[in-house]
Amino acid sequence: MGELLWSPTEEQKSQSEINKFKQYVEKEHGLFFPSYQELWTWSTTELASFWKSIATYFNIKFHSDFTTIVESPADPTSFIGTKWFAGATLNYAEHVFRNTTEKRPALIFQSEQQVKREVSWTELEFMVLKLQVYLKELGVQSGDRVAGVLINGIEAVALFLAVNSIGAVWSCCSPDFGEASIQDRFEQIEPKVLFANSNYYYNGRLFEKAESIKQLSLRLPSLLACVLIDDNIWEEILKMDLAQAELQFTAMPFDAPIWILYSSGTTGKPKAITHGVGGMLLEHMKALGLHQNVQDGDRFMWYSTTGWMMWNYALSALLMGNTLCIYDGATNYPDKLSLWKFAQESKVDHFGVGAAYLISCQDQDLRSLAYQPKTIGSTGSPLPPDVFEWLNLQFPKSQIVSLSGGTDVCSAFLSGCTLLDVYAGEIQCRTLGSKIEAFDEHGHHLYGEVGELVILAPMPCMPIYFWNDLANKKYFDSYFDKYSGVWSHGDWIKITAHDGIIMYGRSDATLNRGGVRIGTAEIYNVLNRTKGVLDSLVICVDHENGSSDMLLFVQLDNGLLNDALKGEIKRELRQQYSPRHVPDDIFQVSAIPYTLSGKKLELPIKKIFSGMTVEKAVSVDIMRNRESLLDFEAISKIWRRS
């Protein structure tokens, strides 16, 4: 068990959104839940009652009512085809703009090159109205796809809301994606319109995109129009005189598509993961309201690009009547405090980032900022215990909310709870409605032991389908081919004695040492604390004779890897964990390879060291730093000959 870091006060418990929801359910259903665990058990066994309670508690506006709440699919081997709120129609954007107020801004935006700008709710609504009129004039209809290659800015938010308001489907890539990577995504969905930034700044450098966007548009024959932000067409849209017009909302079936996200596409074409409008609306209000304690009037920020699902997740803070605070640019430009200063100056209540950024900030003393948000959120990779402890030292009054979920569900099914304590290295709880367990390889439940993260009941945030996935084959193979009738997520977890969760990394990157499986997060926990080591990556290469080699790669802050540092690393791994955690070889590399969404490329590196070519092992267009592969390719050739 990790160290107890934070406990909610009685006032925090009683005023929390999840406590208010618990009291609401108890009154409505004549029940009593003495603890969060009892509430969770009810929510995962009484699915219809729970999700109806979410809809009524958050006052979801249905244009037409539902006839049933949940209907199981005909095929019991998966959750594909589960029908939620049959007959219901609604609109996501309509739920955003019911929060319109002049008391606070809708958006606060800042980038590397622009001063902070506030956008009122009225200004945002008028911008969305103009974009809605333009899309309708083009002939965009419900179900059509509209795509963006956009920075995380005001325009991206307004465009999504306009697209959704007419029942069309949104899909977006970040402009730092490679041209082939963007084409691989958008050619699958055949968008009618493409919006894009002609340039953007990152780390103080200007990147021109106009020509590459032009070339992309020529390779997408479905396009009716391609609009660059700040070009003449965009300016004409914003100049429309619509003083007498009103924003209209198209009622959509509960399971109509809202947006299309994409798998990483590490080794092939990315899967086009399609989510339903009703599922996202209910799930995000539950996740933000109940599990991050996001309440009306708060200010919410999650640092993200538009190509990461956390952009969609953060957007839903607008559903909660929040001011959405947006920062676009490099996290360390001009220094590591840029994000923290923006959050402090913008009075952000809920500050969220990727775990890697928090790990990189450990050498900073942030107490001088005199900033204490309600919550500090982390996701993207496991947050090490020592980073929990550092955050607690810097922000003793803030609840640390570590999240885990994925693009697959566009949400977090492991998250926070203001009724519970925070322990170092642990996620507080399994979220309501998420029937998550840990399984061994035979499908047996595990408690207090490391196992595969599985979901035993459907959730409305699960994909409605993958775009152009005939007979749902890719969908089934992605989640249901390991355990019949059970969603296998691909993460390695342990459920603790007090029902917290410890993340151990991806199960497909698990290290097998003499039959004992080790999560990569344990290795990284030690390396993150090792002086002189900036970053690391570990793999296990299996051999035909049944043996294996654990290989550790380290990026140093300066100098060369020597025997003394190797010895220190091995000694710390042995002392803190076990002899099985000690690598067979340690190599120095210039950089650790990451995807654009911040994931370490463990599996592709394992494939390279197993003899696969770099070209077959990974699609470089999805990489943040493709040049980092050169060291791994060279080392693998030498290592395989030895």
Tell me the role of every PLM-derived stretch.
Residues Q37-W42, A93, K103, L107-L161, ...:
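Conserved AMP-binding/adenylate-forming core of the ANL superfamily
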Residues K103-P105, L228, K239-Y262, K269, ...:
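Conserved pre-ATP/AMP-binding loop-to-beta segment of ANL
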Residues Q113, A196-F254, Q364:
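ANL superfamily adenylate-forming
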Residues C173, F177-S198, N332, Q344, ...:
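AMP-binding/adenylate-forming catalytic core of the ANL superfamily
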Residues V193-S212, D328-N332, S346-E389, V401-V409, ...:
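Adenylate-forming
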Residues A225-L228, L537-D542, L551-L552, K570-S642:
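Conserved C-terminal "lid"/linker of ANL adenylate-forming enzymes
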Residues Q344, T375-L403, T407-G500, S507-T510, ...:
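Conserved AMP-binding/adenylate-forming
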